[in-house]
Amino acid sequence: MNNNKGGFLRSSVFYIFIFLAVVGMVYGLFGNDKTTTKTITSSEFIKALNDKELKSVTVQPGNSIYNVTGTYKKAQTATKDKGLSLFQPTQKVTKFTSTLLPNDASLKSVTDAATKTKTELVTKQAENSGFWLNLLVSLVPVLLIVAVFYLMMNQAGGGKGGQGGMMSFGKSKAKPSDPKDNKVRFADVAGAEEEKQELVEVVEFLKAPKKFVNLGARIPKGVLLEGPPGTGKTLLAKAVAGEASVPFFSMSGSDFVEMFVGVGASRVRDLFENAKKSAPAIIFIDEIDAVGRRRGTGMGGGNDEREQTLNQILIEMDGFEGSEGVIILASTNRSDVLDPALLRSGRFDRKILVGAPDVKGREAILNVHAKNKPLADNVDLKAIAQQTPGYVGADLENLLNEAALLAARRNKSKVDAADIDEAEDRIFQGPAKTNHNMSESERRTTAYHEAGHALVGLVRSEASVVRKVTIVPRGRIGGYALMTPKNDRYNLKYSEAKEQLAGLMGGRASEIFMFNEASSGASNDFQQATGLARQMVTAFGMSDKLGMVQLEGNASVGYADQAGNRAYSEETARLIDEEVRRLAREAFDDAIAILRDNKDKLTAIAEALLEVETLDEKQIKDIYLTGTFTRKDIQDDTELAKAKSFEEAKAAADAKDSQAEQRFEKQDEEKSSDDHSESKNEDTDSTDKSETDDNNTENK
């Protein structure tokens, strides 16, 4: 709207100038009457007066001069005088105007000349309007400057109630939220029951403080939510805002600091002042590590500004005046970099770790996000929760959302297990490259590589299970073997770590064992294996040579300063490298031994991969135990992937849907014919018949 107003103003001024120009032209052409007034100098006036050319003279005091007007006895002829119109070269002049110096000598000379020539002389008093006119003329520029300055200030401030303008830098952007606008409640937060209870207590204290005050308790001044990304820290804060019947101020840590010095501290003061006026109130600072980092670890003016902002937060939370009636919630996934003064009791009294949910928590989260999604009968949310250890709430929500998008792409009315399985692959590995043409040699190498991972994982299966093996290219990989822990893992044993290392080395071991040649496909395996082996040696104390010490793996351990200088000697570094190589070599030798003892099973898994490209957990176990597996109908999106336009993609999806309908109709016809034949058997007991129908349905 501001742009439109500015354009209208500019166009109005333009039309005003056009109008004035036209008026000036009209006045120049037609405005001058035939009786023209001529402006003459003082000398010309005195000469004309002495020559008896003037009929009458009028003298009137003006602005520091005497204004003289009068008429000629005879009309004068004027030629192109500057006081005349350009379109009238010659005119008859009967009147004149002139000026005199405002002194007695000038006035006496005019009076004497008029008396001598017997010319009529008239004197008038000065007009009072001149004073007001002069005053107005002098005030107009001042008023214009004041108006322009006011408009600039108003525009810089963002208008009425505006934010982000030049003059509002020191004002906090946080506004109290209306609980009616926030639909998130504690019932919408699943998988974090203990964390939720801690925050429910805070809300209860605000609503009914007498229950706690009677026992001498005080509400925590600050609650810090810490944990990995995606675990629901901000969602918990939204639930607090939705449940609390008090003003809720929300602000990001990065919103405090701007390009001007002192803005951050000013915004902190303004935020807490507004919260204190609305007390009891809650302040939520998201990603507080953006402003609450440890002091003295950086250089430059930006760091000084951040430290000044942090100091103001420390003062407001627990300074001389305190912040009575105001509770501070904050979230971060980097609590290790926060300043110790910020974390001490009296500021953040309660620290809540919001970690990855366990299997029950994952199932509860899946149930929450599946409420608005129609699921097929073959979808088991409990099984999905068991198969997704380490997933956080954001991952699970994205998993079901991607599955719903895939089901819509395939023109399904419900989300089935195949959609969820494909969605998991797409999220973590990328979409399948169905048009990626691999040579037969590359496919065979990839198949044996992934079969090596799977076989070692099947043999060393005390802690992990092989869920899937595929040679379908996705993202930057040509295939992968998915192995997940059997249960939620909170500690890693030495034997379990050795299992993981052997599984990671299974791919390269299979290449060497079958083809006696290595490929670049194991680079990511080596990266993971090296990282795990290094952690075993430097962080977990699993090396006899180095002992039970922590050399790396912590921000305060392993490095003496910010420049990255190591706190241990070169000899220790050499021992670390030797131990990492030893663990990797032992894992490789273990994998080679497993493959040598199970060569027939390795070949069976690889040939099955070359045939169907993807094997699930049951198929892999069947091949390992029996040498055969059951093939299943796999969703094929090849035609959808090849489509070049929306119309072609829609046609391909409709064709697939039509084929599926024909298949279902055929099954229904077979079922109806079976039911019809059974109805003819009059000797069958009704109870037995009902059981037979149920069995037939289950088999189908």
Swiss-Prot record:
Instruction: Report the membrane topology from the UniProt record.
Output: Multi-pass membrane protein
**Which residues hold ATP?**
G227, P228, P229, G230, T231, G232, K233, T234
Q: Which GO MF terms does the UniProt record name?
A: ATP binding; ATP hydrolysis activity; ATP-dependent peptidase activity; metalloendopeptidase activity; zinc ion binding
Which residues are Zn(2+)-binding? H449, H453, D525
The keyword Nucleotide-binding is annotated on this UniProt entry: yes
| Alphabetical list of SUPFAM superfamilies matching this protein | FtsH protease domain-like, P-loop containing nucleoside triphosphate hydrolases
- Describe its function: Acts as a processive, ATP-dependent zinc metallopeptidase for both cytoplasmic and membrane proteins. Plays a role in the quality control of integral membrane proteins.
Protein's recorded name: ATP-dependent zinc metalloprotease FtsH
* The organism's taxonomic lineage, starting at the top: Bacteria, Bacillati, Bacillota, Bacilli, Lactobacillales
Q: Which gene encodes it?
A: ftsH
